[in-house]
Amino acid sequence: MTPLALIMIIIAYLLGSISSAVLICRLRGLPDPRTSGSQNPGATNVFRLGGKGAAGLVLLCDILKGMLPVWGGYFLESNPLLLGIIAIAACLGHMYPLFFHFKGGKGVATALGALAPIGLDLTGLLFGTWVVIVLITGYSSLASMATALLAPLFTWLVKPQYTLPVAMLSCLIVLKHHENIRRFFAGKEKKIW
């Protein structure tokens, strides 16, 4: 691994470690999403705590945290494996942020941003899958997990060389949803609205 590759991975992790949910809630005078609502610093919890505007800002910032470092890797002509590692680093930063005591979100929006540079067709498939499942079931967590599980298949159909890193990222997202899975099967998982 080259020094530049290592620097790109570190930058991706540090960028991912900026918790937009916590910062936006502070700026808007909302409760800390790590200790309120579902206690997850992500767009869905911020939606419940502060409405569409705050959640939209969190969603945008979280997508950009994943997108910018991967686009940087594309610009520097990194190979697919390195781009995957950069994407995973950004998501790990979001999930386990250095700046916020390693208590982060689930990484769904950051992963969407990290996968967006692969292509708009993949982004559309992922976003469309999430929306359809939310509209049918009302569960953001179920939509996120189902979309994560389908992401490697969609990637294989669009650009197969990225399938392995996307599969690794998908595993991280599903594992991060372990509490949601438990609540869902216990009948205690909350719907998005």
UniProtKB/Swiss-Prot annotation:
Coiled coil: none annotated. InterPro entries: G3P_acylTferase_PlsY. The keyword Magnesium does not apply. It is found in: Cell inner membrane. It catalyses: an acyl phosphate + sn-glycerol 3-phosphate = a 1-acyl-sn-glycero-3-phosphate + phosphate. Pathway: Lipid metabolism; phospholipid metabolism. GO terms for cellular component: plasma membrane. Signal peptide: none annotated. Pfam families: G3P_acyltransf (PF02660). Belongs to the PlsY family. This is Glycerol-3-phosphate acyltransferase. The gene is plsY.
